[in-house]
């Protein structure tokens, strides 16, 4: 990877999947609570596109209120997983700034914002939604898996003006016991007040719990192929 990664802490040890050809687009994908970027780098390598670079950073280890203050990889503190749970506003905003720094690093290395997709699973998906909607750079889109929109009461006012053109693929398991699918549906409803409604796809998967599935990964691949064609 060219460019100085020292000024972007999340890049120094991020798991990456390089493109087989010249990289003209990037997918930045954020893992869920307690995980690392490696598992999603492995999953994304199964649907890789030859001209796309996949970057899967690791969250810092912090005490998590929801898990009895145990220290684990977490993008921000979590107090609960319901639409009315208190939220770590300062932590969410700080995490979003760190992801924006990563986006800007890729832009400096020659990948334009409209060739960058931000995505994530669970807490990582939540952070990807918040970051992309408040980002000053017009990204191509968002892949939001099994997640929610943090600080949802701040939207649509908190969104950047260019956010209305974002394409969003939101996917959710219908049997998710951690982040219920109803929460996902409420999130999709909210997102349609922030971006052009037709740009939001909300797909649900019968029998799937708080995880991904082959059909979902196929939908992600199709979404990325349309948004990030070869140039």
From Swiss-Prot:
The subcellular location is: Cytoplasm
EC category name: hydrolase
Molecular function per GO: lysophospholipase activity; palmitoyl-(protein) hydrolase activity
What does UniProt note about where in the body, tissue by tissue, this protein is expressed?
Ubiquitous; detected at low levels.
Instruction: Keywords in alphabetical order, please.
Output: Cytoplasm, Fatty acid metabolism, Hydrolase, Lipid metabolism, Lipoprotein, Palmitate, Phosphoprotein
Where is the catalytic site? 122 (charge relay system), 176 (charge relay system), 210 (charge relay system)
Indicate where the modification Phosphoserine is found in the sequence: 82
Q: Where are the transmembrane segments?
A: none
Q: State the lipidation positions (S-palmitoyl cysteine).
A: 2
The catalytic activity of this protein is classed by the Enzyme Commission as 3.1.2.-, 3.1.2.22
According to the UniProt record, one GO cellular component term is: cytosol
InterPro entries to which the protein is assigned, alphabetical = AB_hydrolase_fold, LYPA1-2/EST-like, PLipase/COase/thioEstase
Q: Does this entry carry the keyword Membrane?
A: no
**What reaction does this enzyme carry out catalytically?**
S-hexadecanoyl-L-cysteinyl-[protein] + H2O = L-cysteinyl-[protein] + hexadecanoate + H(+); prostaglandin E2 1-glyceryl ester + H2O = prostaglandin E2 + glycerol + H(+); 1-hexadecanoyl-sn-glycero-3-phosphocholine + H2O = sn-glycerol 3-phosphocholine + hexadecanoate + H(+); 1-octadecanoyl-sn-glycero-3-phosphocholine + H2O = octadecanoate + sn-glycerol 3-phosphocholine + H(+)
Q: Which GO terms describe its biological process?
A: acylglycerol catabolic process; fatty acid metabolic process; prostaglandin catabolic process; protein depalmitoylation
The answer to whether UniProt assigns keyword Chaperone to this entry is no
Sections of the chain in a coiled coil? none
Q: What is its main location?
A: cytoplasm
Cite the PANTHER family for this sequence. Answer: ACYL-PROTEIN THIOESTERASE 2, LYSOPHOSPHOLIPASE-RELATED
Family membership: Belongs to the AB hydrolase superfamily. AB hydrolase 2 family.
Q: What does this protein do?
A: Acts as an acyl-protein thioesterase hydrolyzing fatty acids from S-acylated cysteine residues in proteins such as trimeric G alpha proteins, GSDMD, GAP43, ZDHHC6 or HRAS. Deacylates GAP43. Mediates depalmitoylation of ZDHHC6. Has lysophospholipase activity. Hydrolyzes prostaglandin glycerol esters (PG-Gs). Hydrolyzes PG-Gs in the following order prostaglandin D2-glycerol ester (PGD2-G) > prostaglandin E2 glycerol ester (PGE2-G) > prostaglandin F2-alpha-glycerol ester (PGF2-alpha-G). Hydrolyzes 1-arachidonoylglycerol but not 2-arachidonoylglycerol or arachidonoylethanolamide.
Question: What's the protein called, per UniProt?
Answer: Acyl-protein thioesterase 2
Q: Which organism is it from?
A: Mus musculus (Mouse)
